[in-house]
Amino acid sequence: MNNLLNIKSFLKFLGKNKAYTVIDVFGLSVSLMFVILISIYTVQELSVDKFQEHGDRIYAVAYEEGVVTGVPVAYRLQERYPEIERVCPVISNNFNSMIVWANDKKMNANLCFADSSFFNFFSFKLLSGDKNRVLQARNNAVISRTFANKLFGTDDPVGQSIRISDSTSVMVTGVMEDIKNSAIPYTDLLLRIEGVTEFNGSLGMDRYNNAGATTAFLMMKPGADLRPKTDDIATYMKEFFWPYKMELWKKVILIPMNELYFSPIKGNGNSGDKRFVIVLMSVGILILIFAVFNYINLTVAQAGQRAKEMATRRLLGSSRGELFMRLMVESTSLTVISFILGLLFAMAVTS
């Protein structure tokens, strides 16, 4: 009952001091909004690919300046090095805005080509279909949830045919959750890598001439580490891969999947800047500190008026403990109100 009376009295005080209320609540709310937005962004950035079940065993093959290679390279490395359990070359960001047709609808789609083991290799969620069979045949395709809704609406897309750029038809065998929070870019359609030649003649299972389109992912056997053998891999590459034969590329670098997004060596996938994230986190902390100091300064500015009120209440019989609890309830209420407003502001911005 006393707490309710305290809150009621505090609301009267805020009503009498509208300028103080607006500056204090609005200032703290806006500051908390920025802190919330920065926190959401930094958490998202720092959690990229952390959901990958085998992330500690997956590496991307790179050279000094790029996380790129030829389509067959991953398979050649698997044949030679027993440390490798399986491989999954991925071609992304090379076939964006391709025209597709289905159910008399014509749309643009982002295509991605990968090894048939894609869903056993990575931990991307399949909403329908068997991860061991969805890419079993050359003309199989897995469609993203968002693109399935755009193209087929409420109809079940599995078993439906999609025509791509007048030349190729594929059958939808599965629906996957949208790829996000990963170094691997979002894609509308995931196709088998064996079919990439139909869209680009320089790419193929036996074609090395296009060296900048593919990301070769290697999964090591438990406990195995191929990184000490990178010099040997570079020497081996000279036997069959022209950039190494011509000494345009000299080194082989194996980048762990968990570090790929923030790697200074970029490729065809998504990437981030860890220094920017750290700077942004620092800015968020500074904003929070300034907000707290601003709140304290405004509270101190009202100290004289509040001291008279507290003295009057002390004379009327309130104990020190009751006055302390009153101030705590007031401060907590103001902070909670500001946080709720800051959260609503942040939701409005993100929406």
Per-region residue spans from a language model:
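Intracellular coupling helices
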Residues: 4-23, 27, 293-334
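Membrane-proximal extracellular/periplasmic loop immediately following the first transmembrane helix
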Residues: 38-97, 112, 205-217, 230-232, ...
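Selective detector of the "anchor" transmembrane alpha-helix that sits immediately C-terminal
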Residues: 277-297
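Mid-to-C-terminal secondary-structure elements
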Residues: 112-128, 141-272
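Small-residue-rich transmembrane alpha-helices
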Residues: 37, 253, 332-351
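Generic structural signal for small/hydrophobic residues in well-ordered secondary structure
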Residues: 14, 24, 45, 61, ...
